[in-house]
Amino acid sequence: MPKTKKAKDEKSAKKDKKHIAGDEKGLDFARAWVEFPDPADDEQVFRCDLTWLTSRWNCIFGSGCQGIQAGRADDGCCSLGAHFSDEDDEKRVAGHVARLTPDIWQHHAEGTRNGWTSEDDEGSRQTRPFQGSCIFQNRPGFAGGAGCSLHILALKEGREPLETKPDVCWQLPVRRTYEWIDRPDDTRVLQVSIGEYDRRGWGPGGHDLHWWCTSATSAHGAGDPVYVSYRPELVELMGKAGYDRLVELCEERLASQLPLLAPHPADPAGR
């Protein structure tokens, strides 16, 4: 169906609202996706963004991160608190919160006295924002270390941070989505997509973020690609068998003749 002038005007208006910070690249560019059966589940397939997973992104919190809110770079992406994915997520986190102590959680007294959860305007439960950021966020200068106290707890106990932090926190900036696919032979498979959590992943408000790292050149200088540096998180999201197959495909891509097909635009030139 041909697009009407009204539809085009509305689309243009929406585009005008998009905010891209100084060192960020645009959201729309060629990507190399690969689809493969889940080795551990015949009724499931993975669809993975190799452009993202072989990119050289890395977290630069505390070393160049500009933060999602202007003037609050020290908060990183923790300014709004974290929404729980479900009741199990909240219960899991609560078990680890119980082990936090004042020496590693700056707001321990406030959190234990007045609570560490809250509800947003729509009634969804989340970690409580306190003084402009997540209540678990230790501010610069705190003796126990700046940053997420749940992350600090995990490192102190020799755990992976994905064990102690809310789902959304440890998954960022990898995004997992699900879609049932109806095939021509009347069968169905669950398609699990693993890709980049860009500004759009936040919903309409994502375009209003002060800065976002996945498309920023300053956050694309890691020695290892994402599929290597995020191994624990990807294994948790995909299972060991699925991750192992992903590694094979990523290695095949990187071993191919340069330049790569559809490289991430924020990566260093020459890849």
UniProtKB/Swiss-Prot annotation:
Ranges of Basic and acidic residues composition bias in the record = 7-21
Per the record, which residues fall in region Disordered? 1-21, 109-130
Q: Which residues form the signal peptide?
A: none
- Tell me which family the UniProt entry assigns to this protein: Belongs to the Rv0495c family.
- Could you tell me what this protein does? Essential for maintaining intracellular redox homeostasis.
What protein does this entry describe? Probable redox regulatory protein SCO3349
